[in-house]
A protein has these predicted regions:
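Primarily marks secretory-pathway-exposed extracellular/lumenal segments that are disulfide-
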Residues: 1-178
Length: 178
């Protein structure tokens, strides 16, 4: 009797749907973890209104499983709702003198001297999102802040620090198309 045992690795598991928000291009096995693409516009020109709220993202921030954040290529941003649509209201800012992988997200407040909203109102909730640079797909995130008294809302001259992000599986809001 002769027995032979062969072991081989097919590849990593992950979301194999290229239209999903958490698509993993090198995944060989679909693990059923696909999340709808939020289809957010990270190319929007963000206006520096002179009012801001800074959110520090440390190098050791924890992203959800399946989100492989690449600091030099991917995008992380805070959106606000304007007429029911999410609008990018932040910029990722890097300090050239600090190379530990940390960065800041500067979130801009509304310029009240203009008629249209062009930033966050005081107390307006942040809608966090991640965009993968390779696929262009995006998904919503929910932050946990280092200070438990920090809210997830805009505060003029506010400073928060994020400890981790989780995937936000749905964004609720007005469903009336009129």
């Amino acid at each position: 009797l002769v027995q032979t045992s062969i072991e081989f690795v097919i590849g990593s598991a992950g979301c194999t749907d290229p239209n999903a928000g958490n698509y993993v291009p090198n995944a060989a096995i679909d693990d059923g973890s696909c999340i709808d693409n939020a289809q957010l516009d990270f190319d929007t020109e963000v206006t520096n209104t002179g009012s801001n709220h800074t959110v520090y993202i440390p190098a050791d921030v924890i992203f959800p499983e399946g989100v492989d954040f690449n600091l030099e290529e991917d995008f992380l941003g805070a959106f606000y709702l304007s007429n029911g649509y999410p609008i990018l209201g932040s910029d990722m800012v890097f300090d050239e003198s600090i190379n530990d992988g940390s960065f800041q997200v500067v979130i801009f407040g509304d310029d009240t001297s203009t008629p249209d909203p062009d930033g966050f109102y005081n107390g307006q909730e942040f809608i966090w999102a991640f965009q993968d640079s390779n696929s262009g797909n995006s998904l919503f995130l929910s932050p946990t802040y280092q200070n438990p008294t920090s809210s997830n809302s805009y505060l003029d001259d506010g400073i928060f620090a994020v400890e981790s992000f989780d995937i936000l599986y749905g964004l609720t809001g007005c469903m009336n198309s009129d």
